Design a protein with these regions (language model features):
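Iron-associated oxidoreductase/ferritin-like identity signal
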Residues: 1-172
Length: 172
């Protein structure tokens, strides 16, 4: 059984994961309109992944005797000055999500809810991967600079990142 405090914190994380999905979806739309098909595909895949994270939390809350809440979402930013800015925003958001997960883990330890703590370890690991991937992408973007050929290759190569990442993901 979940305490009301942990249930509230998990419901907040459900909202954050849903907003993350919307953020990636908005980024996918922006990239697609700009002709960055590889980036758009990457963002669509990330949006779906964030939705899966949300669903995993929803099921956990409900299975543990809580009531998962679906709440109103903040509208994501839909325009960016450059694809570099878009990925900078992505990285900032992933750091925000990591901090939120860490706070949630802290609450579970304070309340001695070791089952929820154990469940959240998957999210901790996932966020390490998400931040590392965003940082790697930003490093590549910084290497490219204003080179149009580099942007073309990046757009093509990010599809490989999506394929290789998908093959190593947890199937839950």
């Amino acid at each position: 059984m979940l305490s009301k405090n942990i249930e509230k914190a998990l419901n907040n994380q459900i909202k954050i994961e849903a907003e993350s999905s919307q953020i990636y979806l908005a980024m996918a739309c922006w990239a697609e309109v700009k002709g960055l098909e590889g980036v758009a595909g990457f963002m669509y895949d990330q949006s779906n992944e964030e939705r899966d994270h949300m669903l995993k939390l929803i099921k956990f809350v409900n299975e543990r005797g809580g009531h998962a809440q679906i709440s109103e979402l903040a509208a994501p930013n839909v325009t960016f000055t450059s694809f570099k800015e878009m990925f900078e925003k992505l990285f900032e958001h992933e750091v925000f999500v990591s901090n939120s997960i860490n706070e949630l883990v802290h609450i579970t330890l304070q309340e001695k809810d070791y089952a929820t703590h154990n469940f959240l370890q998957w999210y901790v690991s996932e966020q390490i991967e998400e931040e590392a991937m965003a940082r790697t992408i930003l490093d590549k973007i910084n290497l490219i600079g204003d080179d149009k050929g580099g942007l073309y290759l990046f757009d093509r190569d990010i599809q490989q990142l999506t394929v290789s990442t998908a093959s190593t993901e947890d199937p839950q």
